[in-house]
Amino acid sequence: MRDLLDFYASAPLLELGHEADRVREAKHPHGVVTYIVDRNINYTNVCVADCGFCAFYRRPKHGEGYTLSFEQIGEKIEETKALGGVQILIQGGHNPYIPFEWYLDLLRYIKRHHPIHVHGFSPSEVDFFATRFRLEARDVIRELRGAGLDSIPGGGGEILVQRVRDIAAPKKAGADRWLEIMELAHGEGMKTSVTMMYGIGETLAERLEHLERVRALQARTGGFTAFITWPLQPENTPTMSHMPKTDAETYLRTVAIARIVLDN
């Protein structure tokens, strides 16, 4: 890991990018990359997780809190499909007012009236459901899948190092729990994506630790289909508005080292 850390921190950007491209080409030699057209739908912004980096959420009973109706979500799906979209990413805050059956009914409604691939309910949400409704996480996943959930997004991953999570999101599923839920989903035959949000006070070594933990799980299950990374957007966040914004080179270096580490 020390050599990787030195390479990530110190190698010229073009050298780092060239190595990342070499790894990519070894796996995909025909010069073809793929993508999908999808849309994020945040079904509620009411949340009790109180993450320091989140400018989106509103506490319960806040005047700006909302929960979308099934019909509003259906309209957004139809707008997506009209533009060529093939998937929706549906996720939201940890809303203590929504019963578990609502989520199951929503999935059934979507599949019945607006059929589309539903990529939804991150490990953090699954953990919240399990705690809130006194269920095992595996049973939450099975119930959601049975109602129509197709795959699970990597939301709530942030940095999978507990020191960082204790500062940025102490009320949300911890690093081990996040990985555990992903492994449970893979064990149920579900594919998932994985994310990393950086710039929240972690070190470069902790970013690499995040990637190494993801790589180890992928080696066991093969269940991850995509990795997405992005920097903190500090404006209007509860506790991180003072954090410096990272630059474009940091983003390119982070994408490159992720391609090198996540070669499986």
Question: What residue spans do the PLM features occupy?
Answer:
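Conserved C-terminal portion of the radical SAM core fold
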Residues: 92, 113, 118, 146-157, ...
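Radical SAM/AdoMet-radical enzyme domain recognition
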Residues: 51, 86-88, 100, 104-197
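Conserved alpha-helical substructure of the radical SAM core
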Residues: 58-92
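Glycine-rich, proline-tolerant flexible connector loops at the mouths of alpha/beta enzymes
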Residues: 8-9, 35-41, 58-64, 89-101, ...
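Active-site mouth loops of central-metabolism enzymes
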Residues: 38-39, 57-71, 124-136, 167-172, ...
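Cys/His-rich metal-chelating microdomains
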Residues: 50, 54-57
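Flexible, acidic/Gly-rich N-terminal and inter-domain linker regions that tether
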Residues: 1-49
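Short, acidic/polar
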Residues: 70-77, 134-143, 211
